[in-house]
């Protein structure tokens, strides 16, 4: 049989899309085989796509799952990880009791992990918290939390720390992945999160992936893009930019390999091209945008004594923006010619020009997608801005099939970390602790005395590790993440603080992760459908699920842990005496009483459960999830962050906010789609006081570390399809573990040959901060250009993040996991 090139491409891409999406599951057979299985809806535990699943339970266990055919997001499909969701809960080493390091019947930093009661664990924790608060103040204690926590848990922990302990020292691991996107959204539009939705996929003519391997990281969305591309081969294109070739290149019409950090130059070149070729939408620009110029030479978020910080001119004003004009913007991007962009990026000129023409074509609807390649970047905020610039200059924004779209990597990085506000500076609905009027709103809604919430920021993720090491912080509670494996520069900056004898580290986790085994107290955690939950995905969709099975042994949900722990503090112990003197009704109350028995959180009866499982509600005596949600939702209703009522979400397959009069919003800021845009306005970026979005001029600046004679290779890190983050769940699924049991290092064959290496050799990867032992792959799914290697961080036996420099974006404080210098030698 003869196949044309087009037919071959279509067949190959369809096969790739099917395998990536995990379309090997005869889900209908599950129902047919066993009618005694009880099915209920839930949300996938993994990435930020927000796929809906049907969960099958029998005899108190989750025994099956399948894609929910009624869900708009995934339309009945699951990726390979989603298919094996039931097995993440039943690893043989599941934790079932609190475990405290003890010797001779007492806590000892060098002791052995010993089972203790919850009461003993909490009394020990409370003693350490109170001691640290007294010695170091509010930032003496802290929490490192997660974009995997449920919305209810996010509200509970934000209240416990910010309103109870009066400490803003709580930050999520979303700092490592979404902070740059969030900061740039707010700086540009005045409101966080994308204006578009997944429906853009079925409307777009072109997809541009900036630093995103959607084929493996967002496979269900990739299956939709593949379907769109293959059904319209003459009109729809896929364009992929990356520092190495990955599976998304298999479908790409234009695959671009660029040098690390050079995305800044390419994006500025495109802006220059649009202006020089009169391909800008002048009417849109004049009506709906304003120009600003960013501060430059802002450093790399390293320790102040680092020489790179010492020579940077504007470290203290890194986030400052200055009023500007179109003419100044034009002048500032003018140096980014085709020649200069080629010189900096190494990308062939014809490819750069083809990409620029794609954005310039007034008849092409373009969606730009990006993930960690843009966000995990020492200039990640800038890179986000530069993508927005292109869409604002062309007016290709807030329309079906047109817009910039930052994809999230965790199931509720949006819904919990960003919308609830579990960052050191945030409160719900884009409010911030640094603004007095915002604190007053929170105090009123939470029924707290005026002036209680602090304006003092806590330590961001990387700074928490430094503070523990430096003795500025003494207690850390890590919840729903594995930062000892996932964080940067763990040998030099994280581990020393955790094992400092003056510090006390608590880890809440279902499994004995690298973090848990490095802690002093491990709290066993209920996971996924062992609790009632809610997530918010990348397209602003809020989705609920009910508890469907009970957790094993003494394992308790994070929500239970947070609320129960609040009983061990009184206001007299942690609130200022002057505030209590003015508000005597709060004196002597426990934090549990003032935060969770405030007449709002506890107003809903457990009768509403109608006998359904809900361990937390029955323990506390009221429908706590509903109370927390309704209190939280009141922050955003009427302010562009409207959420539907609690009961609606249990009936629906999720709704995209703002939800006004029962109707979700698909495209924000555009008349006819967004209820907050008035008739006749056309477009209104209403998050800004003047309703104008910012077009920001910022330059290319080099990375914090580059290869040299000794460390002669770039290292970039990321994930693979089969595993998620640090593998603490997926490596306990036998099928996923067998499919990819250990980490590898992908290298160009020529680089391997120069070093006397070949495919399969055992090697050492060495940076200025540490080394790992691994195996080389020169033939696999990832194809690296000469001078760059790629590896992952899922393997606890190869702690790849020992190698990573803890440089951050000075504005967002997000870590750059994509660029550092290493050398490779035979082991």
From Swiss-Prot:
> Entry's Pfam families?
Molybdop_Fe4S4, Molybdopterin, Molydop_binding
A GO term for molecular function = electron transfer activity
What Gene3D superfamilies does the record point to? 2.40.40.20, 3.30.200.210, 3.40.50.740, Dimethylsulfoxide Reductase, domain 2
Where does the secretion signal sit in this chain? 1-32
Q: Does the keyword Oxidoreductase apply?
A: yes
Q: Where along this sequence does the record place binding of Mo-bis(molybdopterin guanine dinucleotide)?
A: 81, 148, 173, 177, 210-217, 242-246, 261-263, 372, 376, 482, 508-509, 531, 558, 717-726, 801, 818
Its biological purpose is as follows: Catalytic subunit of the periplasmic nitrate reductase complex NapAB. Receives electrons from NapB and catalyzes the reduction of nitrate to nitrite.
Q: How does it assemble?
A: Component of the periplasmic nitrate reductase NapAB complex composed of NapA and NapB.
Protein name in UniProt = Periplasmic nitrate reductase
From which organism does this entry originate?
Histophilus somni (strain 129Pt) (Haemophilus somnus)
Gene for this chain: napA
């Amino acid at each position: 049989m003869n196949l044309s090139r087009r037919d071959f491409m279509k067949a190959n891409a369809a096969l790739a899309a099917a395998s990536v999406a995990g379309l090997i599951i005869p889900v209908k057979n599950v129902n047919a085989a066993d009618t005694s299985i009880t099915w209920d809806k839930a949300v996938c535990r993994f990435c930020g796509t927000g796929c809906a699943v049907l969960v099958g339970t029998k005899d108190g266990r989750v025994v099956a799952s399948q894609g929910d055919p009624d869900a708009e997001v995934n339309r009945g499909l699951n990726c390979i990880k989603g298919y094996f969701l039931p097995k993440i809960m039943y690893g043989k080493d599941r934790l079932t009791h609190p475990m405290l390091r003890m010797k001779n019947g007492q806590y000892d930093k060098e002791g052995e992990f010993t089972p203790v009661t919850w009461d003993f664990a909490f009394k020990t924790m409370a003693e350490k918290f109170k001691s640290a608060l007294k010695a170091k103040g509010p930032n003496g204690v802290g929490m490192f939390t997660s974009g995997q926590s449920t919305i209810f848990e996010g509200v509970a922990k934000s209240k416990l720390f910010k309103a109870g302990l009066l400490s803003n020292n709580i930050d999520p691991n979303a700092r490592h992945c979404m902070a740059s996107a969030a900061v740039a959204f707010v700086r540009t539009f005045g409101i966080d999160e994308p204006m578009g939705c997944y429906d853009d996929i079925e409307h777009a003519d072109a997809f541009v992936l900036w630093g995103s391997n959607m084929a493996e990281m967002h496979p269900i969305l990739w299956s939709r893009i593949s379907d769109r591309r293959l059904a319209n081969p003459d009109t729809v294109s896929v364009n992929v930019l990356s520092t190495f070739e990955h599976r998304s290149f298999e479908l790409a019409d234009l695959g671009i390999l660029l040098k690390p950090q050079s995305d800044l130059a390419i994006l500025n070149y495109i802006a220059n091209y649009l202006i020089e070729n009169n391909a800008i939408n002048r009417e849109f620009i004049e009506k709906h945008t304003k120009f600003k110029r960013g501060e430059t030479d802002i450093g790399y978020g390293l320790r102040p004594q680092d020489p790179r910080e010492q020579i940077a001119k504007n470290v203290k004003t890194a986030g400052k923006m200055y009023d500007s004009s179109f003419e100044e913007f034009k002048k500032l991007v003018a140096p980014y010619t085709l020649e200069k962009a080629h010189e900096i990026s190494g990308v062939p000129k014809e490819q750069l020009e083809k990409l620029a023409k794609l954005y310039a074509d007034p008849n092409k609807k373009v969606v730009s997608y990006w993930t960690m390649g843009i966000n995990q970047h020492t200039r990640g905020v800038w890179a986000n801005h530069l993508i927005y610039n292109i869409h604002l200059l062309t007016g290709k924004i807030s329309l079906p099939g047109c817009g910039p779209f930052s994809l999230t990597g965790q199931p509720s990085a949006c819904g919990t970390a960003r919308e609830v506000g579990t960052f050191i500076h945030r409160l719900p609905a884009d409010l911030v602790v640094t603004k007095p009027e915002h604190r007053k709103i929170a105090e009123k809604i939470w029924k707290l005395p005026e002036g209680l919430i602090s304006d003092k920021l806590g330590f961001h993720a990387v700074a928490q590790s430094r503070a523990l090491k430096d003795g500025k912080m003494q207690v850390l509670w890590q919840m729903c993440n594995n930062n000892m494996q996932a964080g940067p520069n763990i040998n030099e900056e994280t581990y020393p603080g955790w094992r400092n004898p003056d510090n006390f580290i608590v880890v809440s986790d279902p499994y004995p992760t690298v973090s848990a085994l490095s802690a002093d107290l491990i709290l066993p955690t209920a996971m996924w459908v062992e609790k009632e939950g809610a997530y918010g995905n990348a397209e602003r969709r809020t989705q609920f699920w009910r508890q469907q099975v009970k957790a094993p042994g003494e394992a308790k949900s994070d929500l239970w842990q947070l609320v129960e722990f609040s009983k061990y503090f009184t206001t007299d112990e942690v609130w200022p005496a002057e505030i209590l003197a003015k508000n005597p009704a709060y004196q002597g109350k426990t934090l549990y009483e003032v935060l969770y028995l405030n007449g709002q959180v506890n107003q809903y009866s457990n009768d509403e459960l109608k006998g359904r499982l809900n361990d937390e509600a029955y323990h506390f005596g009221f429908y706590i999830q509903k109370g927390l949600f309704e209190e939280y939702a009141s922050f955003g209703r009427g302010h562009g962050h409207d959420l539907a009522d609690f009961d609606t979400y249990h009936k629906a397959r999720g709704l995209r906010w703002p939800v006004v009069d029962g109707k979700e919003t698909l495209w924000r800021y555009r008349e006819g789609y967004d209820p907050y845009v008035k008739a006749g306005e056309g477009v209104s970026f209403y998050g800004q006081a003047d309703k104008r979005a910012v077009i920001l001029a910022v330059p290319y600046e080099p990375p914090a570390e580059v290869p040299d004679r000794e460390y002669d290779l770039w290292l970039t890190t990321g994930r693979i399809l089969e595993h998620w983050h640090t593998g603490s769940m997926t490596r306990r699924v036998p099928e996923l573990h067998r499919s990819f049991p250990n980490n590898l290092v992908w290298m160009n064959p020529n680089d391997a040959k120069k070093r006397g290496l070949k495919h399969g050799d055992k090697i050492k990867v060495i940076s200025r901060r540490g080394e790992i032992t691994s195996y080389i792959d020169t033939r696999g799914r990832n194809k690296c250009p000469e001078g760059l290697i790629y590896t992952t961080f899922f393997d606890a036996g190869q702690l790849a993040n020992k190698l990573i420099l803890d440089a951050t974006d000075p504005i967002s404080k997000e870590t750059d996991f994509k660029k550092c210098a290493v050398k490779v030698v035979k082991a």
